[in-house]
Amino acid sequence: MGKTVEINPTTRHEGHTKLVLKVDDDGIVEKGNYLSVTPVRGFEKFLVGKPAEFAPIAVSRFCGICPIAHATSAVEAIEDACGIVPPKDGLLLRELTGLGNKMHSHPLHEFLIAPDFIPEKDRVEYITRIQQMRKTGQYIVDTIGGEAIHAPNIKVGGMLKSITPSAVSKIYYKCKEFEKLAKEQVEYLIPIFENRTLVDGTEIPEKLGYHDFGYLATDSTYGNRENIEQKKVHEYTPYDVYEKEVAVQACQLFQEYNGRLMEVGPRARFAKFHDFKEKGAMAIHIARAYENVIHVKRAMEIIEELNVDGLTRAKDPILGDGEKLGLGVHEAARGHNTHQASIDEKGRITYYNAIVATTWNIPLIGKAVEAHYKFAEHVVRAYDPCVSCATQHDILRL
């Protein structure tokens, strides 16, 4: 006869979500619904009418984990709307700040999954390594961005200022340390994920989290608006996806690209740019571990290329025509992140919209949990959802 199983809240990720699962008599999920129940804040609406420079300040408050991704997408959307081209060294500093954020965020996720996969005897060493990695990521953001969480140096037109040669040397040294730790983390974690066994001895089904949807990523490490056709992005509401009694609880929109659900994040980037073929929940963990190494290598490349005496910010006026829709694209830790903005001739925001990484993955997670319901939260955690970022709209149907 079957039943409905509700897991509320789901745990060890950012924000508040629930799973509403229709399962058969054997506990196998026949229909999975994953939804945000995080209260709506409505950032996009209260940004309208504000000066353009306020956008990166505001959107970096979406959450405390992804602030750099949103500030970066915001300034790039405004720059696109106003025809502003930041100087090379400003863009390099901005990219390095974003890498620092990911070098903090990915290890944080690996901390959150420790109770699932890491034997108690290994946890002190494992968590110590993670905290050292996170410290480096935060140091990069703090040094370049001006603050480790809400970085004030990310400005429309580039970056507020450069860094000193001494800071460059310190960042490079810390990146070398991070690279060593990241490689140790890969050597430790990959066999665990490939073994598909939880710390209590439970074997994870080989095809847990398998799906046949697409992958969306615009760049291996940063973001590129030229690699996405925005006209193919379609947003729709929970009422288009869930049954009414479920939809009325949901606090997020959804997206399709060219009529198809798309996964974003580490595995999507690996599939697009590194010919990664693995599927399932464990493959996302594997891709994320490898990305730590890729991120720090790119960070060191930027340090080699950066001219600390170069111009960091364009001086163009932040003025638009009120019509052109600017597009800011950034590959956040959790995946493809887009902000859209229109700016009028007085430099004020006339339209703002954020299409956040986790909103791409939420409907896909609901479909990917279709195994035994006791494994559903492991699928959720594999995607490392950041639900506060994904909860900016409310839909009311009377």
From Swiss-Prot:
Binding site for Ni(2+): 63, 66, 386, 389
Keywords (A to Z) from UniProt: FAD, Flavoprotein, Metal-binding, Nickel, Oxidoreductase
Needed co-factor(s): Ni(2+); iron-sulfur cluster; FAD
Recorded GO MF terms: coenzyme F420 hydrogenase activity; ferredoxin hydrogenase activity; flavin adenine dinucleotide binding; iron-sulfur cluster binding; nickel cation binding
Keyword Isomerase among UniProt keywords: no
Superkingdom: Archaea
Signal peptide: none
Function: Reduces the physiological low-potential two-electron acceptor coenzyme F420, and the artificial one-electron acceptor methylviologen.
Homology family: Belongs to the [NiFe]/[NiFeSe] hydrogenase large subunit family.
Protein name: Coenzyme F420 hydrogenase subunit alpha
Organism of provenance: Methanococcus voltae
Lineage: Archaea, Methanobacteriati, Methanobacteriota, Methanomada group, Methanococci
Gene: frhA
